[in-house]
Amino acid sequence: ASALHNRVALNIAARFLEAARPRGCRVYMSDMKLRIRDEAVYYPDVMVVCGEGPPHPYYEEAPCAVVEVLSPATEALDRREKRAMYLSLDSLQVYLLVDPERRRFTAYRLTPEGFVEEEGEEVDVPCLDLRLTLEDAFRL
């Protein structure tokens, strides 16, 4: 991954961590596995999990927020396969794709009618009671 990719992921994780600690939530970066039933394992760029501790020392299963920072090599996977798998999780409230080249967010946000796709410069992360902005993500 590029330096920009890493910086953006770290900025988002740091912003999430500020909000997560007082809520007893956990924030992970790309070295923690997300296991989706017995079907797949992914390593999201950033993941937030609230509630009880991990089901296993090496993976989580119930994130409320997942972030992928797009890169040319992974964009198709992030937008298709991973999106379908992540949105199948009962715990998920928001799946955020960050495009570092275009500097924009695409969020899949859970509503009573199901997931809604939104593009913009900010996204609400309900489990952290946080609004993440492009400025947060791209701070140098």
What are the residue ranges of the model-derived segments?
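Gly/Pro/Ser/Thr-rich low-complexity, intrinsically disordered segments predominantly at protein N-termini
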Residues: 1-140
